[in-house]
Amino acid sequence: MTTGDNTPVPDFLSRLRVDGRTFVVAGAGVGMGRMTSHALVQAGAKTVVCVDVDADRAAEIAAEIGPAGVAWVGDVTTREGAARLAADAEAINGRIDGLVDIVGMARWESILDMTDETFDWEIDICLRHAFLLSQAFGRLMSKSGGGTMVFIASVSGFTAAPMHAAYGAAKAGLMAWVQTLAIELGGFGIRANAVAPGTILSPRMEAVFSDEQRALNAGNAPLQKMGATADIASAALFFSSDMSAYVTGRTLVVDGGVDAKFPYPVTL
């Protein structure tokens, strides 16, 4: 089919498919990583390497997504772990088509009370490991015709929150890192993008949020609800597929509109 000016019309739904491709999901055992693994398989991925530091979690999600799932256990915040993951993943099908990096955690400490250990831990788990993974997988993808990298950032990298300084700084650094990845690796056919979630009601958050906290977070969003892990998985699939074939170096905010909201004391 063509348009009136003879421009070919693509099959848009097929652009969201990732048939036959091999992906690595770092942090696949819980929440957003778990849902992203399902999204990739539903879109046709041949293999999804499910990475977690916990052997039971890795095995569980690999079994859950079916024959495409491959469990991998290790610590990707070390150079040795990142290199081993890249080598093991490449050995499965001879190439890696996409990386989705969802590794990261936050500690709540004020700047005046923060220890060196907490600051270093946040930088390592939210930023430094992304350097290790993107370097290891970038080297592989640059030799095999390209691929996609998707990193989970945070709205904390755009806007500040009390007790969140090290986490926010690491996530802001991650978004800057993604931009440089995009311009350095674009010539190899590698696209790098990030997703910045707002408050997502993951199983981990469900376990700690009170009803009052849930209502407060939902009410703060223009959409009047909290996000779900499927919302983040959908964004990760978009960036991992040809639906975003001409998008690189970008961060997509998925927060229900919170980041767009000026806290003006007027209700409609």
Name each model-derived stretch.
Residues 45-60:
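Conserved glycine-rich Rossmann-like NAD(P)H-binding loop of the short-chain dehydrogenase/reductase
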Residues 134, 170, 178:
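Active-site helix of classical SDR
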Residues 134, 191, 225-254, 259:
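C-terminal substrate-recognition "lid" of short-chain dehydrogenase/reductases
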Residues 139, 183-187, 245:
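Alpha-helical segment proximal to the catalytic Tyr-Lys
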Residues 11-49:
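Canonical Rossmann dinucleotide-binding motif of NAD(H)/NADP(H)-dependent dehydrogenases/reductases
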Residues 154:
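Residue(s) in the substrate-gating loop at a strand-loop-helix junction
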Residues 110-111, 115-123, 217:
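Substrate-binding pocket helix/loop in short-chain dehydrogenase/reductase
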